[in-house]
Amino acid sequence: MAKDIKFSADARAAMVRGVDMLADTVKVTLGPKGRNVVLEKAFGSPLITNDGVTIAKEIELEDHFENMGAKLVSEVASKTNDIAGDGTTTATVLTQAIVHEGLKNVTAGANPIGIRRGIETATATAVEALKAIAQPVSGKEAIAQVAAVSSRSEKVGEYISEAMERVGNDGVITIEESRGMETELEVVEGMQFDRGYLSQYMVTDNEKMVADLENPFILITDKKVSNIQDILPLLEEVLKTNRPLLIIADDVDGEALPTLVLNKIRGTFSVVAVKAPGFGDRRKAMLEDIAILTGGTVITEDLGLELKDATMTALGQAAKITVDKDSTVIVEGSGSSEAIANRIALIKSQLETTTSDFDREKLQERLAKLAGGVAVIKVGAPTETALKEMKLRIEDALNATRAAVEEGIVAGGGTALITVIEKVAALELEGDDATGRNIVLRALEEPVRQIALNAGYEGSVVIDKLKNSPAGTGFNAATGEWVDMIKTGIIDPVKVTRSALQNAASVASLILTTEAVVANKPEPAAPAPAMPAGMDPGMMGGF
């Protein structure tokens, strides 16, 4: 395919147009008075959202060069979302600011490499300064505040706070759609382990790329399943029940995996295969945990059991299992309460006798998975559109809360970024490195400027007053008042803020150091078929 190439200023200008189109669409959602964006969907009603990464992923531009710029900013939002689960709009605003300030200087003759070096140095200093002013998050009330700020709902903050209290900060919390109008919290027994499906063709929800199995059987073995004949009798028995099957094995390969996938695609029966969690003796112990939780038996040579001889009585059962590409969650296993209690007691006794910190950590993980549970926040709303929007907000809030527990919090509303300006400005740099530092200094103001603008205030006035205010004091855009941000509950997780800044600086630097852009030329339209010889155009109605 032929390529279209742009160089230097032309290349950067085209990419920046794409950056602006995406950033201008996303940044209107920033802050407590941020607006919504309506996204057209191929099927069903439009999606109304203020979630930055959701908006960014939907944007596709016609011009190839502009689209590359937009996609790079979308990557900033996605990466920030992957790391911290929130802060995607802030990351987008920071990227646009660094790109614009940087482009002015590059166009004026500054060296892009020197600017990049200065940006990286200034960003690293800002991140260290953010960590230095972070405050740890502990207690139900503090956790509720973080969640409430992210979701813009005190009620959601209470749900997430209660869920984390009941299943632990690292417990499994899922978000589902409720059949009613009200949002509610349920905590159900369950277990999660870090192994996902072996083939993406096993998913039942192509949009979320997850496999949801209702009332499934569970085959648990430490063996490798390569020959489909080994489990064929068992598969035939499961097929008669018309219930799905989860296979947890050392591996599923050879002819077995494609055979299972083919039957899933054809709709013969629903099956998902995952690798067994852990390694060595720990794997055997975890498989036994799963078997006890689900009322099944581990098919292992240690017990003299073979796959080909396995019967339905060896299979575990559960009310529901959810499998994505990275993890499996088993909810309401059918194991007996007595057997589970005995297993928990055994693990506790091992905890008391072990002298290894590593073993203690792994035993505590197993104990939490057996004795803990899965918290389910069931989201209710009057309409499907409102339901989707609420789910996205709760997901953001949950991620932000976990990030806050992990690395602490700082004053929200962009206040912390203004606070660290003094540390960055103190950097003694020269030449283009100093120019890079100054670009970051200007970009650090941009989130506050945009939050104020979205709330109907003049950003420059707010920034000037903020720079001269006592530490911790900031502008509450929701009320127009100057308050102690942390005491008022306007807070941001450090992990979210630093990830947004680091990812924005990284991608913006790449755009500034771009000297050539190569894109596919659009395919020419196919010519219309030739008219047969001797045919009068008037025969076509004169058109």
UniProtKB/Swiss-Prot annotation:
It is found in: Cytoplasm. SUPFAM superfamilies: GroEL apical domain-like, GroEL equatorial domain-like, GroEL-intermediate domain like. Its EC number is 5.6.1.7. ATP binds at T29, L30, G31, P32, D86, G87, T88, T89, T90, G413, N476, A477, A478, D492. One of its GO terms (molecular function) is unfolded protein binding. The keyword Isomerase applies. The keyword Isomerase applies. One of its GO terms (cellular component) is cytoplasm. It is an enzyme of class 5 (isomerase). It catalyses: ATP + H2O + a folded polypeptide = ADP + phosphate + an unfolded polypeptide. One of its GO terms (biological process) is protein refolding. Its main location: cytoplasm. Keywords: ATP-binding, Chaperone, Cytoplasm, Isomerase, Nucleotide-binding, Stress response. Pfam families: Cpn60_TCP1. Forms a cylinder of 14 subunits composed of two heptameric rings stacked back-to-back. Interacts with the co-chaperonin GroES. Belongs to the chaperonin (HSP60) family. Together with its co-chaperonin GroES, plays an essential role in assisting protein folding. The GroEL-GroES system forms a nano-cage that allows encapsulation of the non-native substrate proteins and provides a physical environment optimized to promote and accelerate protein folding. This is Chaperonin GroEL.
